[in-house]
From Swiss-Prot:
It catalyses: di-trans,octa-cis-undecaprenyl diphosphate + H2O = di-trans,octa-cis-undecaprenyl phosphate + phosphate + H(+). It is an enzyme of class 3 (hydrolase). It comes from Syntrophobacter fumaroxidans (strain DSM 10017 / MPOB). This is Undecaprenyl-diphosphatase. It is found in: Cell inner membrane. GO terms for biological process: cell wall organization; peptidoglycan biosynthetic process; regulation of cell shape; response to antibiotic. GO terms for cellular component: plasma membrane.
Length: 281
């Protein structure tokens, strides 16, 4: 992989990470087209994706810097220094607990099924296309049944747990981490913007942990040129990711996610046609 390819993949990562259309699906499609996904070492591609996600995580930290700082300081004050009972804590401190609670399922499943996630099965276009369609339809259903009444201040532990388990489904390529969590948030009655904001905050622990872990393990097989490519891709994903967050939050204040539903189903259908008609894998 050269720097230009890395920049293009970083751009794709940043543009698709926060839209509910699956960054993994688009990156894997682009990677296969470029010929940089190794059939002999699929774990190298998994590591590349996980590490450049640190760029999009940086975008979340920068965009939500005030929220993250407020949650962190309030959480420390009310839990460490004042040692308040949970029911007496502010919604800001409780939100910190909800992010922790919602992160536990994906941390557990991610470690248990790490080998499967890194294997060739998760690079299969059949798996990716099926996930695009199935989870796209679920997103469409959530738009129909959602009440759109719950703000960020009204999120409960049950909401956090449901969205957290939905994040586990994002381990399936093509599902989309933002897609599954926003879908779950809508099913739980959140407004579209609230579902997206909580989804983005929930991404911080999961993406940081997986990215740093994969980066540590990738040191065993990366050369100096690989580091330059990785750094370029990560920086590009941070810039494009920041712009995508700003766009999506504005978009969801006035529009539904139906355009993404249609896109997912059409893309998934096209991929299935390519697989069965032309034998593309």
């Amino acid at each position: 992989m050269n720097v230009l390819q890395g920049l293009l993949l970083g751009l794709i990562q940043g543009l698709t990470e926060f839209l509910p259309i699956s960054s993994t699906a688009h990156l894997t499609l682009a990677g296969k087209w470029m010929g940089v996904v190794s059939a002999e070492h699929p774990e190298h591609w998994t590591a590349f994706i996980a590490v450049i996600q640190l760029g999009t995580m940086a975008a979340v930290l920068i965009y939500f810097a005030r929220d993250v700082l407020d949650i962190s300081l309030t959480f420390l004050e009310e839990n460490v220094f004042r040692r308040m009972r949970f029911k007496d804590q502010s919604h800001v401190s409780k939100l910190g607990w909800y992010v922790i609670l919602g992160s536990l399922p994906v941390a557990t499943f991610g470690l248990v099924f790490k080998k499967v996630i890194e294997g060739s099965l998760t690079k299969s276009l059949i798996v990716i296309s099926a996930s695009l369609i199935v989870f796209g339809i679920l997103l469409g259903v959530s738009e129909v049944v959602a009440r759109f009444s719950k703000s960020i201040k009204r999120i409960s532990w049950l909401d956090a747990l449901v969205v957290g388990f939905a994040q586990v489904m994002a381990l399936v390529p093509g599902a989309s981490r933002s897609g599954t969590t926003i879908t779950a948030g809508l099913f739980m009655g959140m407004t579209r913007e609230t579902a997206a904001r909580f989804s983005f905050l929930l991404s911080i622990p999961a993406v940081m942990a997986s990215g740093l872990l994969e980066f540590r393990e990738s040191l065993d097989f990366m050369g100096s040129q690989d580091f330059l490519v990785l750094a370029s891709a990560t920086l590009m994903s941070a810039v494009s990711g920041y712009l995508t967050i700003a766009f999506l939050l504005r978009f969801l204040r006035r529009h539904s996610t139906n355009v993404f539903v249609v896109y997912r189903v059409v893309l998934g259908g096209a991929l299935l046609w390519m697989v069965f008609r032309h034998g593309v894998v």
